[in-house]
Amino acid sequence: MTVAVYPGSFDPITKGHMDIVERAAQIFHEVIVAVVINPNKKPLFTMDERVEMIRMAVSHISNVRVESFSGLLVDFTRKQGARAIVRGLRAVSDFEVEFQMALMNKRLYPEVETVFMATHTDYAFLSSSMVKEVASFGGDVSDYLPPAVLARMAEKYGDTVRGKAPVR
């Protein structure tokens, strides 16, 4: 049974992330969406909120589970019995950084393979940071987020993120 880990901060999880999760779930027996605690980032959503939103977003996929972790990805991957790390690539610039991380992960955990998945062209421009920025200015981000996540964004930024005009 091949287990894969798909790591990220997922603040919030987007439809681009979901595309990777759904496709990885078709390849691997089990996919663990690993929500990382990154002390260098100031998240919009707490760890518990992110885990909860992701669990709601992936609830229709039977072979996906969601966990949080801190520390080295390879340590988490090894503890989970996973042999693959899934990474989504939006552009060549993503590959530069991801390739270096894959090589380091291989050094630290020789049994692990990094699997790069090209993002669907509909989401090649998309990032959590971009979604948060658009939402912070009252923009409509409804095309980019799973429904449960969109509801949480509306709680933070108001209904304009759903494409609804503010009530006057």
Swiss-Prot record:
The record marks H17 as: Transition state stabilizer. Substrate binds at S9, K41, L73, R87. Pfam families: CTP_transf_like. SUPFAM superfamilies: Nucleotidylyl transferase. It comes from the Bacteria. It is found in: Cytoplasm. Its EC number is 2.7.7.3. The gene is coaD. Pathway: Cofactor biosynthesis; coenzyme A biosynthesis; CoA from (R)-pantothenate: step 4/5. Belongs to the bacterial CoaD family. GO terms for molecular function: ATP binding; pantetheine-phosphate adenylyltransferase activity. Keywords: ATP-binding, Coenzyme A biosynthesis, Cytoplasm, Magnesium, Nucleotide-binding, Nucleotidyltransferase, Transferase. GO terms for biological process: coenzyme A biosynthetic process. One of its GO terms (cellular component) is cytoplasm. ATP binds at S9, F10, H17, G88, L89, R90, E98, Y123, A124, F125, L126, S127, S128, S129. This is Phosphopantetheine adenylyltransferase. Homohexamer. The keyword Nucleotide-binding applies.
